[in-house]
């Protein structure tokens, strides 16, 4: 993958200046970084702190411990003047340089890890929760990530240089060891032990003490060779762990880069959608403004019409009040006239009934009088031979008048009808008595015969 060097100048300024502020220590990313974020790339669940476990162990185990072989007696104290040999100076200088480089690497690795963790956390934001502010923050984060990637690339180059230096040191140490003959080394060690024992027994001999000091210096040189070998092994182990950490970081970097491409694509789509939505919103806002103007004009017109109609309403209300009062007065007059009309109608109906009753009575009386006068029995002699026949004629006349009376006046009872018929007969008889006084006996006999009939006996009050 090609290396992005667009932000290499910022890293070089930070790396060359020991008092510069790290571009990765941004308070914004500390606030955005959760306590333990989990990032999903495809089908892999990546836990940041689990992936960085080995890297943190490397940071804790960076110092190289120098130990004294157990074969050498601790009672022998080396002379400080013997450590000033050229070989000892070179070894101590190389060790100091290595420790300085390791400390610098530790700080750089820690800052890169912090930057990667922050990028992991920001990449874990769901797309549906991404807003315009978070997109701009994410763009700024990718800029910082690019700086961190450049920093990581330079750190890898520095690790390669350290590896080459370690390999060179190990090669020179091997050459120095090859110069020593194993047999002579064993003889020297045996001689050293022998002389040491003699020096312990004979401490007053000055020449032996000088020889002992020389042997001590020789032992210290051998110890330095062993310590250098231990340091080389430690550095090799550290280099292997750093390679493992670099592989992890490289894999995470590729995943972050792919995630960044997707987010950039989504960011571009969101920008396009946002632009379209803003244009649509502006169009809708302008449309609403125009509608508001039209509505305001309509509102003004409605207010003017409302004032005009209010004035008309007052006028109509005054007219309505006057009309209502007049209608109430007319209604009262109408009710009064209606009551008077009802009274008059009642009187008229009553009078009409009386008139009709009188007319019917008069007509009946007149008809009965005429009929009875024609049906009256004339006396043929001293004997009443035809009295029974005349009685039947009178009886038929009375029944006919009774039926006529019931038809003309249905409300009239049978007793009243009989009373009316008898009154007619009586009046007719009186008229006959006045006009023809020569027939009083025959008339009395006829009336007596009629009143003795069974029909009249049923109505005793009429007979009485």
From Swiss-Prot:
Gene Ontology molecular function terms on file: structural molecule activity
Q: Which domain of life is it from?
A: Eukaryota
As for subcellular location, the record says: Prospore membrane; Cytoplasm, Cytoskeleton, Microtubule organizing center, Spindle pole body; Cytoplasm, Cytoskeleton, Spindle pole
Region annotation Disordered: residue ranges? 71-102
User: Main subcellular localization, coarse class?
Assistant: membrane
**GO CC, any one term:** prospore membrane
Coiled-coil boundaries: 99-119, 156-193, 231-365
Q: Which UniProt keywords apply?
A: Cell cycle, Cell division, Coiled coil, Cytoplasm, Cytoskeleton, Meiosis, Membrane, Sporulation
The Gene Ontology biological process annotation of the record reads: ascospore-type prospore membrane formation; cell division; vesicle docking
Provide the assembly information: Interacts directly with SPO21/MPC70, NUD1, SPO74 and SPC42. Probable component of a spindle pole body (SPB) complex composed of ADY3, SSP1, DON1, MPC54, SPO21/MPC70, NUD1 and CNM67.
What the protein does comes down to: Involved in the pathway that organizes the shaping and sizing of the prospore membrane (PSM) during sporulation.
- In its UniProt entry, what is this protein called? Meiotic plaque component protein 54
Phylogenetic lineage: Eukaryota, Fungi, Dikarya, Ascomycota, Saccharomycotina
Q: Which gene encodes it?
A: MPC54
